[in-house]
A protein has these predicted regions:
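Substrate-binding pocket helix/loop in short-chain dehydrogenase/reductase
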Residues: 97-98, 102-107, 201, 205
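Residue(s) in the substrate-gating loop at a strand-loop-helix junction
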Residues: 141
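Short C-terminal tail/terminal secondary-structure segment
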Residues: 224-225, 236-249
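Canonical Rossmann dinucleotide-binding motif of NAD(H)/NADP(H)-dependent dehydrogenases/reductases
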Residues: 3-33
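Active-site helix of classical SDR
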Residues: 121, 156, 164
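Alpha-helical segment proximal to the catalytic Tyr-Lys
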Residues: 126, 169-173, 233
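A glycine/serine/threonine-rich, flexible loop-to-helix segment
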Residues: 173, 185-209
């Protein structure tokens, strides 16, 4: 198993990509803590994993709250003894140009998407140090590479990209790796209402990708699994783009 004897904490793990990542991690031998503000969905995912023989704990986690992050890390250590893997998966999207973006919207998106990654990383590093190393996987976006029309979202995901590189350099000597994942358009409960809720929208977004379809959560989860595992032991500060060829055009 690719994650045997590993302990992982996944933010935004109640549904969508985070839930798929959690289930895949457990299938590969990991023990998992999922954190989210969506308590009902989180408890459902926890039950689904445990009913199949996996080991999963759900904790309420507001990623903008430093104390909540400390509590989530403590939950992983208290239940499973250590922390090896952090997946900063939680995020939101707002699609507005600069003039239509309010200060409140900017602050909300930056707090969840960028500050949340910072706080998660900060909370996880001391326990990874005790464990002798670890892997941090930050979910950015192709919007963090190319910009586009999503002002606050692109800025937040660009921040994730460079925070990843900064963290990678700072902690490489302690065996703590940090890499970012940059998805294209992925069919999730977050993106579907905004982009994929009509056949026209689905066709348009599928056509943007040279492979001719939008991505599925599993497409991203397999990449996250690789970065979380020891198979990627010589990768840190890197960008894993999983976008159906969109940014190659």
């Amino acid at each position: 198993m690719r994650l045997e004897n590993k302990v992982a904490l996944i933010s935004g793990g109640a549904r969508g990509m985070g839930a798929v990542e959690a289930k895949m991690f457990v299938q590969e031998g990991a023990k998992v803590v999922i954190g989210d503000v969506l308590d009902e969905d989180g408890k459902q995912t926890e039950s689904e994993i445990n009913e199949t023989g996996g080991e999963c704990v759900f904790v309420h986690l507001d990623v903008t709250d430093e104390t909540a992050w400390q509590d989530a890390v403590a939950a992983a250590v208290d239940r499973f003894g250590k922390l090896d893997i952090l997946v900063n998966n939680a995020g939101i999207a707002r699609i507005n140009n600069v003039e239509d973006t309010t200060s409140d919207e900017w602050d909300l998106v930056m707090d969840i998407n960028a500050k949340g990654v910072f706080l998660g990383t900060k909370a996880a590093i001391p326990e990874m140090r005790k464990a002798g190393g670890g892997s941090i996987v930050n979910i950015s976006s192709i919007a963090g590479l190319t910009g586009g029309r999503t002002s606050s979202y692109a800025a937040s995901k660009g921040a994730v990209r460079l925070l990843t590189k900064s963290s990678a350099i700072q902690y490489a000597g302690e065996g703590i790796r940090c890499n970012s994942v940059h998805p294209g358009v992925i069919e999730t409960p977050m993106t579907t209402p905004m982009m994929l809720n009509t056949q026209e929208g689905r066709d348009l977004n599928a056509s943007r990708h040279p492979l001719g379809r939008v991505g599925q959560p599993e497409d991203i989860a397999y990449g996250v699994l690789f970065l979380a595992s020891d198979e990627s032991s010589f990768m840190t500060g890197s960008e894993l783009v999983i976008d159906g060829g969109l940014t190659a055009q």
